[in-house]
Amino acid sequence: MTTITPEAARLRLAQYLSPAFPTGGFAWSQGLEWAMDQGAVTRATLPQWLEDWLDHGAGWCDAVLLSLALRRGADHAELDDLARAMCPCARRLAETVEQGTAFAANVAALTGRPQSAAALPVAVGRACGCLPLPAGEIIGLYLQAQAAALISAAVRFLPLGPVEGQAMLAGLQPALLAAAARAGTADPKDLASATWGADLAAMRHETMVTRIFRS
């Protein structure tokens, strides 16, 4: 087995979680588009939406699932079933499964090691479990990539400039690190979501007549 140094592993991780890695993440918004369209999320309230996503919503659930998938001996098939069951509606299920499937296919093509389709956090955990990096570091960068994708969706929809969006991401970074640290020691019973507004937004997005994003 080829050994990879921590320095090379960080580059590999940054590549996997880059928006340039072809998973189609730019096409999804986790229901944020509907909330913005209805005026429930504005440039003033977006930071709170992101904090709730991270502490009580899909961000936290993804962090726990990723943490579990990174561990030696993890049952990735069981975790994939759990990740799918946690999705509140059809488009959120499609969002994580389609991105995870693309991620797995790309990693398999790059590494020559087969990767079966899975929900995104499980696919990432399975691919990155062999990297000689702390779990908190992997989870933190994953969460930042997901938060950046949501902010990018807001930049494309709201009157929100890209620099202001980057400032929001920078302001969220202490919370990202804290969530990653908590998730690093989490177990399945810590999986929970209480962002009903975001879940309802994702459901209502499915019936929008005109939309930019797929969720």
UniProtKB/Swiss-Prot annotation:
The keyword Chaperone applies. One of its GO terms (cellular component) is cytoplasm. It is found in: Cytoplasm. GO terms for molecular function: nickel cation binding. Keywords: Chaperone, Cytoplasm, Nickel insertion. The keyword Chaperone applies. InterPro entries: UreF, UreF_sf. Belongs to the UreF family. Required for maturation of urease via the functional incorporation of the urease nickel metallocenter. UreD, UreF and UreG form a complex that acts as a GTP-hydrolysis-dependent molecular chaperone, activating the urease apoprotein by helping to assemble the nickel containing metallocenter of UreC. The UreE protein probably delivers the nickel. PANTHER family: UREASE ACCESSORY PROTEIN F. This is Urease accessory protein UreF. The gene is ureF.
